[in-house]
Amino acid sequence: MNLLVLSRNPQLYSTSRLVLAARSRGHTVTVADPLEFRIVIAKGLPAMFLNDAPIGRTDLVLPRIGASITNYGLAVVRQFDMMGVPVLNNAVAIARSRDKLRAMQLLTKKQIDVPITVCARTPESVELSLKLVGGTPAIVKLQQGTQGIGTMIAETPQAVTSLLEALWAMGQDIVLQEYISEARGADLRAIVVGGRVVAAMRRQARAGEFRSNLHRGGSSQRVDLDKRYAQAAVAAAKVMGLEVAGVDLLEGKSGPKILEINSSPGLEGIERATSVDVAGAIIAHAERLLLRRTRRKNRKDEVIEGERRTTRMRESLIPIPVAGGKRVNLVRGA
């Protein structure tokens, strides 16, 4: 398999682990910065150039699109899809998961539990919004953000109002979310690959910090998810349409609550906490995905060829009228 990994930095742990896992299984791997691609849009001829040269044979694309380049990165991913190249994850799924509000809307439509979330844009709406999420403390989030960036806690109604007004003045779209006190600064991160949880860990925020992200100094330990939590993680990834996902869950009084879904989950923390070869699991799923696609294509080609043979056979018959208005078909050249 010729695998293309879209990543701005080949030295990142997650990128280098995916490259190592793929090469150890005999695959050829190229790492390319999404911003270095040139997209050619033409009727019937979508194309891509990398560093001003046409891209070579690519069997599958594995995107690692950072939040800072979401728009152009998704355009590159969509172009590969238009060219018929399999992508693990596709642009629509990535875009869904990046928009926190959209993700919550889709999850609740499928009856998947999430923290109570409110979106508003006027100062007059703050008081009601705060009541809807259960008062303070409350969580204020930018609609797009990763690794805990853009996630804040407001301890008082005045702090909520000040935060919201400041963010709105900067043109930011935000959501207000209930604070799940029983989680005690901890959450669960489950890595879902191909519809199953391959690894999971519990993350605990450091003292004085409410965000449990490892990039924010949190600690982690391996955990075996019970059935309800594993099912919730798998269902959340499925709703987004993600083949590979990092699903963050809170342990609420009533059970799992989906906090966030990441289309490019970091591998360092989860692999070190669990000793699970997550990168290998992702590459193995890419192999299965490509194999299924190849088999479907072969079956489709067989059907098309069978239809062509049938058409040729029908065209080779000559209708001959006989007495009584009946016809007899004779094979041409017989």
Where would I find each of the regions flagged by the language model?
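A conserved helix-loop-beta module that forms one wall/lid of the active-site cleft
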Residues: 23, 27-34, 77-149
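Protein kinase-like catalytic core scaffold
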Residues: 138, 198-199, 245, 257-260
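ATP-binding N-terminal substructure of ATP-dependent carboxylate-amine bond-forming enzymes
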Residues: 1-88, 92-93, 332
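A short linear hydrophobic-aromatic micro-motif
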Residues: 116, 137-140, 174-178, 244-247
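A long amphipathic alpha-helix within ATP-dependent nucleotide-binding catalytic cores
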Residues: 170-173, 209-258, 280-296, 306, ...
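Phosphate-binding site of ATP-dependent enzymes
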Residues: 151-240
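Glycine-rich phosphate/pyrophosphate-binding beta-alpha loops
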Residues: 67, 262-275
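Short, hinge-like loop/turn segments at secondary-structure boundaries
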Residues: 46-50, 104-108, 133-135, 156-159, ...
